[in-house]
Regions:
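Radical SAM enzyme core and accessory elements
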Residues: 3-5, 61-70, 382-385, 390-498
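N-terminal [4Fe-4S]-dependent radical SAM core
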Residues: 9-18, 147-191
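Flexible glycine/acidic-rich beta-alpha junction loops that bind and position SAM and/or redox cofactors
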Residues: 12-15, 111-112, 197, 247-249, ...
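Glycine- and acidic-residue-enriched helix-capping/strand-helix junction motifs
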Residues: 14-31
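Radical SAM [4Fe-4S] cluster-binding motif and immediate context
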Residues: 26, 170-332, 340, 353
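Glycine-rich beta-alpha loop elements in corrinoid/cobalamin-binding modules
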Residues: 30, 34-37, 44-162, 380
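Short, electropositive alpha-helical surface patch
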Residues: 59-60, 254-260, 344-362
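Catalytic cores of alpha/beta
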Residues: 112-119, 282, 342-357
Length: 498
């Protein structure tokens, strides 16, 4: 018996040019875990990664069919309105074979029955944490040649029973390293799953069905490292846990021990954690053991917004955490929702002052990131439900799994749209400039100009944000649109776009 794991294409769109919120980073290991589970069940395995593919539907389906799988399981990551492509591929597979067609991952878990209705050729979905479900499903499929109704399996026309979370993460197999992951010199690895937070914008607790963090035995983590480091050359580690540092003294000591493990491997590492897990002494210890980067989801510089989105942290805690990272010399990456749907213009300006106070608006890429992000609303999320109940959900029949929303203050929405377009122009322009730098290494040209004008671009983005906020306070919408055009022209000129 053979299972084929498929990573679906994820085309880049202008509207979501710099968005990564369609899946948590932990999803990068999903296919590897599925393949490892199947191998333990005695199944032949194959992985087809079309994440960056530009093939058409017919060619994609032909490659999948050529593998001769008994089950084809799509790790279906939401691709910003391009779901029709996967639906077409599924229809071709269904017409030309008797293969069982399934999907798993965050997007299928959130979308569930709506996805089964959208993709009528899809036979089943593995909802939520899937490893034990798949481990139980494969032997039964070998015996019966059909997908059994099991906890964690959503079948068309059948009632669904959820599966309990895995009690001991140490029993998980070592994931295969496949697809795009093999092209990176950094190794993604998980020391825990889940998060004790319940932020309203986050999908993690929806995926697992609870706000709970589970850790694995460190001996199993060390075994996984030994196995995966023996497969290929690795330059660094990245811990993809939603929150690397847990609560309490024991969890802080555990984080320190993981740092010592990374040091014994001779590898620098990065991680993500909640603000309330940070203290400077621990960060200094981690830095001493090789920590080079940390991602903090601070999300806002307003206590009122932090309360609305259920962050359970304060701006003072954020200040302390950011300064602790800065003092330890660890590279800081930030999650920030500038345009929270209920924001006021005053809160936007408060956010700006907060970021300036902490010295976070000094580098153009980070400035562009921090001054433009709004909240992503996908089908099945808490935000979809809440905006729907308030009559604020803006649906588009072309995008059945993604929605916009009405800002409580329309002027905030105007500034958000303007900054979104300006920063999209910036990121797409910088991509082109960097590509030209790589293609013509001996021609300084635009690449050198982009480097030289970095300070000017940074100042321009900041000035645009403040000017748009001030204009939205007192002027009609047309004035905001006119101002956006002025700044777009300045941005084009500064970057020397042709």
């Amino acid at each position: 018996m053979k299972i084929v794991i498929v990573e679906n294409p994820r085309p880049l769109t202008l509207e979501h040019y710099n968005d990564v919120a369609n899946a948590p980073l932990s999803a990068s290991l999903n296919s590897g875990y599925a393949l490892a589970v199947a191998s333990l069940a005695g199944w032949e395995t194959a992985c087809l990664d079309f994440s960056t593919s530009k093939l058409d539907e017919e060619s994609t389906a032909a490659i999948i069919l050529a593998e001769g799988g008994d089950i084809v399981l799509f790790h279906w990551v939401y691709s910003w309105g391009h779901e029709e492509f996967v639906r077409s591929v599924l229809e071709m597979l269904s017409r030309n074979s008797n293969v069982a067609l399934g999907a798993f991952g965050l997007f299928p878990t959130l979308a569930t029955r709506n996805l089964l209705q959208f993709a009528s050729s899809l036979d089943f979905i593995l909802a939520g944490e899937f490893e034990e479900t798949l481990s139980e499903l494969l032997p039964l499929f070998t015996e019966r040649r059909t997908v059994a109704a099991l906890p964690g399996v959503l079948l068309r026309g059948r009632s669904y029973v959820s599966r309990r979370l895995i009690a001991d993460l140490s029993l998980l197999p070592v994931p295969d390293d496949v697809g795009a992951n093999c092209g990176y010199t950094s190794l993604n690895i998980a020391a825990s799953r889940g998060c004790y937070g319940a932020c309203s914008f986050c999908f993690i607790h929806r995926y697992y069905g609870c706000s709970r963090r589970r850790v694995r035995d460190l001996a199993s983590l060390e075994r996984e490292l030994e196995t995966r480091l023996s497969r290929r050359d690795i330059a660094s580690l990245y811990f993809i846990d939603p929150t690397f540092i847990g609560q309490g003294g024991d969890e802080r000591e555990r984080a320190s021990e993981i740092g010592r493990l990374a040091r014994r491997c001779g590898l620098p590492f990065g991680f993500e954690t909640r603000v309330d897990g940070v203290d400077e002494e621990l960060l200094a210890t981690l830095a001493g053991n090789g920590a080079t980067s940390v991602f903090l989801g601070i999300e806002s510089g307003c206590d009122s917004v932090l309360r609305r989105i259920g962050k359970r942290i304060s701006t003072e805690q954020i200040r302390c955490a950011v300064r602790s990272v800065q003092n330890c010399g660890i590279e800081l990456h930030l999650g920030f929702i500038m345009f929270e749907p209920d924001s006021t213009l005053a809160e936007l300006e408060e956010n700006y002052l907060f970021l300036e106070e902490l010295g976070l608006l000094d580098q153009r890429d980070q400035t562009a990131n921090l001054l433009y992000h709004n909240q992503i609303v996908l089908y099945g999320s808490a935000a979809w439900e809440s905006f729907g109940s308030e009559g604020r959900l803006l649906l588009d029949e072309r995008l059945p799994f993604e929605a916009r929303y009405r800002f409580r203050d329309e002027r905030v929405g105007q500034v958000c749209a303007a900054m979104g377009r300006l920063t999209s122009h910036y990121f797409s322009a910088m991509t082109g400039i960097r590509q030209s730098r790589s293609a013509v290494a001996d021609d300084c040209g635009a690449a050198c100009h982009a480097t030289d004008c970095g300070g000017a671009v940074n100042s321009l983005l900041k000035e645009a944000f403040l000017s748009l906020c001030r204009t939205a306070h007192t002027q009609p919408p047309q004035s905001v649109a006119d101002l956006e055009r002025e700044y777009a022209a300045q941005l084009h000129g500064t970057l020397a776009l042709r």
